[in-house]
Amino acid sequence: MGTIEGNVAVLKKLREMLSRQREKLEDYLHLLECQGDSIQEGDTQKLLAQVGLEKSLIADIFTLKKVIDPLESLYQACYPAGTESSVPQLQDVLETMGTEIMVRNARNRERLRERMEEIRNEITSLRAWPRESSRFSPAAPSLIDITT
């Protein structure tokens, strides 16, 4: 295989991997949107399932990143800066998506923090201390006779 064919193969593989990473990031963005809705609704079962999916997606993204890094090194060796334009465009899109993920993740963390505070306040209000005694409960003695 000549150098041109090798360069083209590296370019194709890198584009394919970057496209797969973009798809995973799109899935992650959609998942973050669904998580935000679940947090607002207070649906813990959905949120738990989404957290499991999130862990899986993040693992997939990191695996792809491990494959992409060596391909990028080969790409930079094969193509001097500015000779090929599709890969830098894909990388810019991925960077933008990464920023959007950070923003949505921060928003979801804040929503979750607010929801947890609401639940804490609700629990505190349910545990109001001291409680009023019931009419049906026996009266508690309040004086002690120590003369005997």
Predicted regions and their residues:
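Short terminal interaction segments
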Residues: 84-148
